[in-house]
Amino acid sequence: MTLRLLEDWCRGMDMNPRKALLVAGIPPTCGVADIEEALQAGLAPLGEHRLLGRMFRRDENKNVALIGLTVETGSALVPKEIPAKGGVWRVIFKPPDTDSDFLCRLNEFLKGEGMTMGELTRVLGNRNDPLGLDPGIMIPEIRAPMLAQALNEALKPTLQYLRYKKLSVFSGRDPPGPGEEEFESWMFHTSQVMKTWQVSDVEKRRRLIESLRGPAFEIIRVLKINNPFITVAECLKTLETIFGIIDNPRALQVKYLTTYQKTDEKLSAYVLRLEPLLQKLVQKGAIEKEVVNQARLDQVIAGAVHKSVRRELGLPEGSPAPGLLQLLTLIKDKEAEEEEVLLQAELEGYCT
């Protein structure tokens, strides 16, 4: 229904539906300024865009907004949802034809690698192939199948470009918005994921910028304008300088001891959010490796919303503190039990 609404709305405005998006699930209380702020952060990877209109949907009791783009975009760049007021807003767009979308993403990849379509076909041995002609005069129905067959044998690594694990979202806002991470946990996750990517630094930088919103995005955008060849390492170093913790063990320790579980946060998520800070303290020598498990447990108990963590996990006073994996296992087992009890209670309430 929403895709049909997008098509009908664009037809009424004489617009190309592939140069527009529909954002659904917007609370009626959100004004134009609220919507534009969310769009600026959530649709940053798409480049220039503008809010064209709003409409109230009675069946959802929510607003939808029509967003205009300057160019057609591929499915790899369009987020399925964006964090905003009232939770997350859904993003609906008209997917390109399969062949055209394939070629669009392939061209983006080649551009990032500094190659042209003609160079690619020559590398594959098709020196006299019509693919070496001007791409503008070739139709996708001819070009895409030939490229797909060649790539299946010669360019399997490029699938890393087409399918990859996206980074979590970071904006630099304090406190973080819905769906956003604090810097330490975001940096830890980003560093781990980037190790798995077998792509060029240019593509890594694009994926990094894709994960940024708000102030963090603006900082890197300005840096990239001033230095188009800025590296991923330089981007991360800048973000760490601005948003990271001061390189001071005492300041780091204060941050660690004042990091508490959020009201709606699972205890297991709190432990994982705390871990990068703890590991930094160990690296700085502020906490000895021999007592890291005890230090972790002490802060989890002190920072948890419920103060009966030790008893609920069956950890007697004076007993050795469990390691990270063992602690997470205990916590997740307890969370699973609690969810089962809640589910059972809901079912009983439904049946009575």
From Swiss-Prot:
Q: Which GO terms describe its cellular component?
A: cytosol; mitochondrial outer membrane; nucleus
The record's keywords, sorted A to Z, are: Apoptosis, Autophagy, Cytoplasm, Membrane, Mitochondrion, Mitochondrion outer membrane, Ubl conjugation
Q: How is it modified after translation?
A: Ubiquitinated and degraded during mitotic exit by APC/C-Cdh1, this modification is inhibited by TRIM39.
Q: Which stretches does the entry tag as region BH3-like?
A: 120-127
- Segment RASSF1-binding: which positions? 204-207
Is Hydrolase a UniProt keyword of this protein? no
Q: Which GO terms describe its molecular function?
A: ubiquitin protein ligase binding
Is Cytoplasm included in the keywords of this UniProt record? yes
- State which tissues express it: Widely expressed, including in the brain. High expression levels in testis.
Question: GO biological process annotations for this chain's record?
Answer: apoptotic process; autophagy; extrinsic apoptotic signaling pathway in absence of ligand; extrinsic apoptotic signaling pathway via death domain receptors; intrinsic apoptotic signaling pathway in response to DNA damage; positive regulation of apoptotic process; positive regulation of autophagosome assembly; positive regulation of release of cytochrome c from mitochondria
Location in the cell: Cytoplasm, Cytosol; Mitochondrion outer membrane; Extracellular vesicle membrane
User: For the motif LIR, what are the positions?
Assistant: 49-52
* InterPro entries in the cross-refs: PNMA (IPR026523), PNMA_C (IPR048270), PNMA_N (IPR048271)
Question: Assembly state and interactors?
Answer: Homodimer. Under normal circumstances, held in an inactive conformation by an intramolecular interaction. Interacts with BAX. Binding to RASSF1 isoform A (RASSF1A) relieves this inhibitory interaction and allows further binding to BAX. Also binds to BCL2 and BCLX. Recruited to the TNFRSF1A and TNFRSF10A complexes in response to their respective cognate ligand, after internalization. Interacts with TRIM39. Interacts with RASSF6. Interacts with ATG8 proteins MAP1LC3A, MAP1LC3B and MAP1LC3C. Does not interact with ATG8 proteins GABARAPL1, GABARAPL2 and GABARAP.
Q: What is known of its domains?
A: The protein is evolutionarily related to retrotransposon Gag proteins: it contains the capsid (CA)subdomain of gag.
Q: Which family does it belong to?
A: Belongs to the PNMA family.
What function does this protein fulfil? Retrotransposon-derived protein that forms virion-like capsids. Acts as an effector of BAX during apoptosis: enriched at outer mitochondria membrane and associates with BAX upon induction of apoptosis, facilitating BAX-dependent mitochondrial outer membrane permeabilization and apoptosis. Required for death receptor-dependent apoptosis. When associated with RASSF1, promotes BAX conformational change and translocation to mitochondrial membranes in response to TNF and TNFSF10 stimulation. Also promotes autophagy: promotes phagophore closure via association with ATG8 proteins.
Which named protein is this?
Answer: Modulator of apoptosis 1
Organism from which the protein derives: Mus musculus (Mouse)
